[in-house]
């Protein structure tokens, strides 16, 4: 499916730093609850991520990631997800987080 440049510009992807990671036992598939700091303009957002196979909780803290921050909130079990963390998904659904190649300021927009 082809999209227009105007469609792409509507997707607000920003860099944020993971500042909190908790287990999410209520999720249907193994997942973590993440708190991500997107800087002063966007603030701290929560997200659920099915990345327990590849990442330990302690390895995620202070890691920068890329997320879509302008999707509507989504209820996942008892948790309200406020952004979508992006990653590359392999054939076995193993997700590798998308992150900047060097540390950048939280909140920088991807474009």
Labelled PLM ranges:
Residues 1-111:
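Phosphate-backbone binding interfaces of nucleic-acid-interacting proteins
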């Amino acid at each position: 499916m082809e999209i227009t440049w105007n469609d792409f510009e509507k997707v607000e992807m920003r860099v944020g730093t993971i500042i909190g990671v908790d287990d999410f036992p209520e999720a249907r598939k193994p997942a973590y609850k993440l708190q991500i700091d997107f800087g002063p303009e966007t603030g701290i957002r929560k997200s659920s991520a099915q990345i327990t196979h590849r990442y330990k909780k302690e390895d995620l803290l202070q890691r920068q990631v890329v997320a879509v921050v302008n999707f509507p909130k989504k209820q996942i079990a008892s948790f309200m997800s406020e952004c979508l963390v992006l990653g590359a998904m392999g054939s076995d659904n193993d997700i590798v987080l998308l992150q900047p190649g060097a540390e950048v300021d939280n909140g920088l927009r991807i474009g």
